[in-house]
Amino acid sequence: MARIAGVDLPREKRIEVSLQYIYGIGKTSAKLILERANVSPVTRTKDLTDDEVRRIRETIEQNVKVEGDLRREISLNVKRLMDLGCYRGLRHRKGLPVRGQRTHTNARTRKGPKKGLVRKAAAPAPMA
């Protein structure tokens, strides 16, 4: 099993698909990485030679931010926006949609489950 960027890649899938298991690599970047590393995209992960795995690993390390580094950069960017106190930072802080979506209805994913109304307990019957 090939291990690249701290991720075990599935053995039976094509390397083009296997690379997408790494956080930060999608279809397009997987194709570019394989093109730069001079590896055929239809090769199964189990059929890769040690030299091909090394070339893929080096290409990713040199050209692409993946896994922990990418997650750290994204979280620092969000934290920076919140520290600035700009509109986007405030939206992040409040847990609301950041990119201009409506919130009167929808936005449930970002806002979380509905908070139900808390009703008052029924008043006791007046004593006669």
UniProtKB/Swiss-Prot annotation:
UniProt region (Disordered), positions on chain: 95-128
Keywords: Ribonucleoprotein, Ribosomal protein, RNA-binding, rRNA-binding, tRNA-binding
Cellular compartments per GO CC: cytosol; small ribosomal subunit
Biased composition (Basic residues): 95-118
GO BP terms: translation
Pfam families to which the protein is assigned, alphabetical: Ribosomal_S13
GO terms of molecular function: rRNA binding; structural constituent of ribosome; tRNA binding
Keyword Repeat applies: no
Transmembrane helix listed as a keyword: no
Function: Located at the top of the head of the 30S subunit, it contacts several helices of the 16S rRNA. In the 70S ribosome it contacts the 23S rRNA (bridge B1a) and protein L5 of the 50S subunit (bridge B1b), connecting the 2 subunits; these bridges are implicated in subunit movement. Contacts the tRNAs in the A and P-sites.
Assembly information from the UniProt record: Part of the 30S ribosomal subunit. Forms a loose heterodimer with protein S19. Forms two bridges to the 50S subunit in the 70S ribosome.
Membership in a protein family: Belongs to the universal ribosomal protein uS13 family.
Protein's name in the database: Small ribosomal subunit protein uS13
Source organism: Anaeromyxobacter dehalogenans (strain 2CP-1 / ATCC BAA-258)
Source organism phylogeny: Bacteria, Pseudomonadati, Myxococcota, Myxococcia, Myxococcales
Gene name tied to this protein: rpsM
